[in-house]
Each structure stands twice: as C-alpha cells, then as structure tokens.
Amino acid sequence: MGMLNEFKAFAVKGNVVDMAVGIIIGAAFGKIVSSFVGDVIMPPLGLLIGGVDFSDLAITLKAAEGDVPAVVLAYGKFIQTVIDFVIVAFAIFMGVKAINRLKREEAVAPTTPPVPSAEETLLTEIRDLLKTQNQNRLP
C-alpha cells in the first residue's frame, strides 16, 4: 500500500499534472500544424511550383512485383514533415521568448525596502548617539 500512496503523491504534484497537460496540448497542436501544412500551405506551394502534390513526390527504388509493394523514397512527405517541424519549433520559440520576457520584467521590478520597525528606528538612533559621543571624546 505504501508504493501506491507514493505514486499518488507523485502523480498529483503540480509539475507532473502540468507536464501531462502540456503533452496532451502539444499532441493536439501537432495535429493542427500537420493539417495546416498539408491542407493549407502545401497545395498553393505545389500550385506555384507547377501543380505538384508534395505528398506524392517520391523516387521509386524498386518497382512493385506482384503482391510486394514498390520501394520508394517519399521525399515529398519528408518535406511536409520538415515544414511541420519548423512551424512547431517557431511557435515554441515564440512562446518561450514571451515567457522569458515576462520573467525578466518581474525580476527587474524594484522592490521597496521594508520600513524599519519602531524598535529598529530607536536602536539606530541610540547607535548614532553613541557614535557621536565617542567621536567627541577622542582628542
């Protein structure tokens, strides 16, 4: 039973829950970006290049024989995946940059020194009076 309680304590910590939410949102964001690249960016880009569908771009290394499928290098799908990665990496970069800017602004905000208590003020005055008396006694 002890291990189960330890696991519960670990699983409900803020960092673990935050990480799980981040992974789920990241997976959903990845699907959105893949759709954006495949359905919105690549068709016009293929049209500009000459009516090319990037997902069909491939080099056939060995033709299909009977039930054995062809061996191909699907470089069009690779190009789409690279564009997916660049968009996701850029979005993450912009998010981290914004978070770092907010952290910097919080760190730069000046803090006012705490107001000394009445006891501290009294002790400071006594110290200053003793210093003055000691300076007056010295020849």
UniProtKB/Swiss-Prot annotation:
Keywords: Cell inner membrane, Cell membrane, Ion channel, Ion transport, Membrane, Transmembrane, Transmembrane helix, Transport
Bilayer-crossing regions: 9-29, 79-99
Gene Ontology CC: plasma membrane
Keyword Endoplasmic reticulum recorded: no
InterPro entries linked: Mechanosensitive_channel_CS, MS_channel, MSC/AndL, MscL_channel
Membrane topology: Multi-pass membrane protein
UniProt GO molecular function: mechanosensitive monoatomic ion channel activity
UniProt-annotated location(s): Cell inner membrane
SUPFAM superfamilies in the record: Gated mechanosensitive channel (SSF81330)
Signal peptide per UniProt: none
Origin: domain of life: Bacteria
Function: Channel that opens in response to stretch forces in the membrane lipid bilayer. May participate in the regulation of osmotic pressure changes within the cell.
Subunit structure: Homopentamer.
Family statement drawn from the similarity comment of this UniProt entry: Belongs to the MscL family.
Protein name: Large-conductance mechanosensitive channel
Organism: Pseudomonas putida (strain GB-1)
